[in-house]
Amino acid sequence: MGSRFLLALFLVLLVLGCEVQAAQQLQQDDPGSPALLDKVQESISSYWDTAKAAAQDLYQKTYLTSVDEKLRDMYSKSSAAMTTYASIFTDQILTLLKGE
């Protein structure tokens, strides 16, 4: 068991040494240039904004009042049904827990 412990300790120290070395190399890079993470975040944010704007434009171009009314009606009916079933389920669970 002592050799396993030493092997595990050696591996942990090796990983920590690699992390410290990588952190030092990152600090030695030019501090004036933005980090890779910042570039990735900006790129993803740009793509997201573009996709959101395109989706909003498409929605506004294809907006139909009758479809919107049907969707609202379907949502209200389904949420009412889910509320009913959730209350029935809650009542059944409480009955099982109380033992009535």
Swiss-Prot record:
User: Region Lipoprotein lipase cofactor: what ranges?
Assistant: 78-100
Q: What does the entry give for GO biological process?
A: lipid catabolic process; lipid transport; positive regulation of phospholipid catabolic process
Q: What is its main location?
A: secreted
- Give any Pfam family that matches: Apo-CII
Q: Where in the cell is it found?
A: Secreted
UniProt keywords, alphabetically: Chylomicron, HDL, LDL, Lipid degradation, Lipid metabolism, Lipid transport, Secreted, Signal, Transport, VLDL
Lineage top rank: taxon: Eukaryota
An example GO CC term for this entry is: chylomicron
Q: What does this protein do?
A: Component of chylomicrons, very low-density lipoproteins (VLDL), low-density lipoproteins (LDL), and high-density lipoproteins (HDL) in plasma. Plays an important role in lipoprotein metabolism as an activator of lipoprotein lipase.
After translation, the protein is modified as follows: Proapolipoprotein C-II is synthesized as a sialic acid containing glycoprotein which is subsequently desialylated prior to its proteolytic processing. Proapolipoprotein C-II, the major form found in plasma undergoes proteolytic cleavage of its N-terminal hexapeptide to generate the mature form apolipoprotein C-II, which occurs as the minor form in plasma.
Record's InterPro entries?
A: Apo-CII, ApoC-II_dom_sf
Q: Can you name one GO molecular function term for this protein?
A: phospholipase activator activity
Q: Which Gene3D superfamilies match?
A: Apolipoprotein C-II
Q: Keyword Zinc on this protein?
A: no
User: What name does the UniProt record give this protein?
Assistant: Apolipoprotein C-II
Q: Where is this region: Lipid binding?
A: 66-74
The record's family statement is:
Belongs to the apolipoprotein C2 family.
